[in-house]
Amino acid sequence: MSDQQQQQPGQDGQPFFNIQRVYLKDLSLEQPNSPHIFLEQEQPTVEVQVDVAATQLAEGVFEVTVIGTVTTKVKEKVAFLVEAKQAGIFDIRNVPVEQMDPLLGIACPTIVYPYLRSNIADTIGRAGFQPIHLAEINFQALYEQRLASAMEEAQAAGGNGGIVMPDGSKATH
């Protein structure tokens, strides 16, 4: 056996990224018009909303949550409403500050989202409805859209504003 201490990942100064855990944080299903809604013959309308949130839990440890809401209506009556939060805990160390936000807003949600899709489809199917398989999401395009929108809002609010990165510098795009 060696007397050398074994270094923990990320302690050598090299960028380190690890998925600690992916888990279902919250799931709810509402069927306010069951069982009568099952007798309707009309095609339902489906509305899907997806959002992303990130929280720092400890130094180098982050939780990224992808929130999905699916509302299905038949003749303006809600057939079902599913709300789910799928989360992941990630170890992220020695990553340059300017890369953290895209990592948390693009890479992590891309890892978590397939689990959310599966859980929502499974829940809808188990509720007695045809499963709805959510489309793939380009989280980079979504991130860039939100960044542009936030910059527009900041400029409209103060004229000289902008997004401030974690290191205090202003975002350049």
From Swiss-Prot:
SUBUNIT field: Homotetramer, a dimer of dimers. One homotetramer interacts with 1 SecA dimer.
Localization in the cell: Cytoplasm
Recorded coiled-coil stretches: none
Protein name: Protein-export protein SecB
HAMAP family on file: SecB
Entries under Gene3D superfamilies matching the protein: SecB-like
GO MF entries: unfolded protein binding
Species lineage: Bacteria, Pseudomonadati, Pseudomonadota, Betaproteobacteria, Burkholderiales
Protein's job: One of the proteins required for the normal export of preproteins out of the cell cytoplasm. It is a molecular chaperone that binds to a subset of precursor proteins, maintaining them in a translocation-competent state. It also specifically binds to its receptor SecA.
Keywords from the UniProt entry: Chaperone, Cytoplasm, Protein transport, Translocation, Transport
Family: Belongs to the SecB family.
GO biological processes: protein folding; protein tetramerization; protein transport
